[in-house]
UniProtKB/Swiss-Prot annotation:
SUPFAM superfamilies: Prokaryotic ribosomal protein L17 (SSF64263). Pfam families: Ribosomal_L17. GO terms for molecular function: structural constituent of ribosome. It comes from the Bacteria. GO terms for cellular component: cytosolic large ribosomal subunit. Belongs to the bacterial ribosomal protein bL17 family. NCBIfam families: L17 (TIGR00059). One of its GO terms (biological process) is translation. It comes from Pseudomonas fluorescens (strain ATCC BAA-477 / NRRL B-23932 / Pf-5). The gene is rplQ. This is Large ribosomal subunit protein bL17. The lineage of its organism: Bacteria, Pseudomonadati, Pseudomonadota, Gammaproteobacteria, Pseudomonadales. Keywords: Ribonucleoprotein, Ribosomal protein.
Length: 128
């Protein structure tokens, strides 16, 4: 029985899933808007939102935890210097998922994942 088991496997090994969501989170924080499949977008929330919550309290330990989860010094800097301050008063719900139709090749449901209160402008980066 599958009772109380959370998370989607997405037809990947655990190491592949971990690497994929790490890369997607880095792309999301870099561009603030990405386009991906709907199931991946929903699972990305579980990775990205805790990182923003972590960035609200700036400490060396939190920076090291964020680096451990993103492996990017530039993104850690943006998280703590920009995003942590931007969402200091918001109690969660940092991401918005917008459905945007279906992919041409396999009819997979697609979605935009964007940071709430982001500066408007720019193009979506595809993270498939």
């Amino acid at each position: 029985m599958r009772h109380r088991k959370s998370g989607r496997h997405l037809s990947r090994t655990s190491s592949h899933r971990k690497a994929m969501f790490q890369n997607m989170a880095v792309s999301l924080f870099e561009h603030e808007l990405i386009k991906t499949t709907l199931p991946k977008a929903k699972e990305l929330r579980r990775v990205a939102e805790p990182l923003i919550t972590l960035a609200k309290t700036d400490s060396l330990a939190n920076r090291r935890l964020a680096f451990d989860r993103t492996r990017s010094k530039a993104i850690v800097g943006k998280l703590f210097n920009d995003l942590g301050k931007r969402y200091a008063t918001r109690e969660g719900g940092y991401l918005r998922i917008l459905k945007c139709g279906f992919r041409a090749g396999d009819n997979a449901p697609m979605a935009y994942v964007e940071l709430v209160d982001r500066a408007v402008g720019g193009e979506a980066v595809s993270a498939e």
